[in-house]
């Protein structure tokens, strides 16, 4: 198992980044929030999970071990493969996912594309006991994110995805104004992307 990769970022795409490890460029699939934290030319470390199929080897990367472990946990549920597991973590932060599973929150889980009411009920039934105490400790001691830092990181990520600086700034400001207390970077990025829609 490849537990993590570290090296300079060669490129960042819409759904993956290429990180050079020992002279080899490794394509690592990740969520938009994780990709937003990567900068071309800078060194990065991602916690990874290697999915082996008969015709492919696919590497998935995460900002921390908790997200990587949840990615693996999700795939122990019936009908959940790596794509749906990654989509779930793209929509729900690790602490949100843990709370939704432990509390039986179907509404939160059905925010994920591809997860309907029956699928959400199955996830809760199969994973609630496996989440354990993570839900109660995932966000313990976390500091409130700085509004200026969040604004800057999300704007840079949107520009990197092909939106203009003006579009990025306007969408981020709109999301922050609507949210009131500042959200974390991944939440603001998701809402900004939803507001902007697909890039023309």
Curated annotation (Swiss-Prot):
Pfam families: HHH_5, RuvA_C, RuvA_N. The keyword DNA repair applies. Residues 146-200 are annotated as: Domain III. One of its GO terms (biological process) is DNA repair. Residues 1-63 are annotated as: Domain I. Residues 141-145 are annotated as: Flexible linker. The keyword Iron-sulfur does not apply. CDD domains: UBA_RuvA_C (cd14332). Has three domains with a flexible linker between the domains II and III and assumes an 'L' shape. Domain III is highly mobile and contacts RuvB. HAMAP family: DNA_HJ_migration_RuvA (MF_00031). Homotetramer. Forms an RuvA(8)-RuvB(12)-Holliday junction (HJ) complex. HJ DNA is sandwiched between 2 RuvA tetramers; dsDNA enters through RuvA and exits via RuvB. An RuvB hexamer assembles on each DNA strand where it exits the tetramer. Each RuvB hexamer is contacted by two RuvA subunits (via domain III) on 2 adjacent RuvB subunits; this complex drives branch migration. In the full resolvosome a probable DNA-RuvA(4)-RuvB(12)-RuvC(2) complex forms which resolves the HJ. This is Holliday junction branch migration complex subunit RuvA. It comes from Saccharopolyspora erythraea (strain ATCC 11635 / DSM 40517 / JCM 4748 / NBRC 13426 / NCIMB 8594 / NRRL 2338). The lineage of its organism: Bacteria, Bacillati, Actinomycetota, Actinomycetes, Pseudonocardiales. The gene is ruvA.
């Amino acid at each position: 198992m490849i537990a993590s990769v570290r090296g300079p970022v060669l490129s960042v795409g819409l759904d993956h980044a290429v990180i050079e490890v020992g002279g080899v460029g490794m394509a690592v699939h990740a969520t938009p929030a994780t990709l937003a934290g990567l900068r071309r030319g800078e060194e990065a470390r991602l916690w990874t999970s290697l999915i082996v199929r008969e015709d492919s080897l696919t590497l998935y990367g995460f900002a921390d071990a908790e997200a990587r472990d949840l990615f693996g946990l999700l795939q122990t549920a019936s009908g959940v493969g790596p794509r749906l597991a990654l989509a779930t973590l793209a929509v729900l932060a690790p602490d949100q996912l843990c709370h939704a599973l432990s509390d039986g929150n179907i509404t939160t889980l059905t925010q994920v594309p591809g997860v309907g009411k029956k699928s959400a009920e199955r996830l809760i039934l199969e994973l609630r006991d496996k989440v354990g105490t993570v839900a109660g400790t995932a966000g313990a001691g976390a500091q409130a994110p700085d509004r200026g830092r969040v604004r800057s990181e999300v704007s840079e990520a949107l520009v990197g995805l092909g939106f203009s600086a003006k579009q990025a700034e306007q969408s981020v400001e709109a999301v922050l104004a609507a949210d009131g207390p500042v959200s974390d970077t991944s939440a603001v990025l998701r809402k900004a992307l939803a507001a902007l829609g697909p890039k023309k």
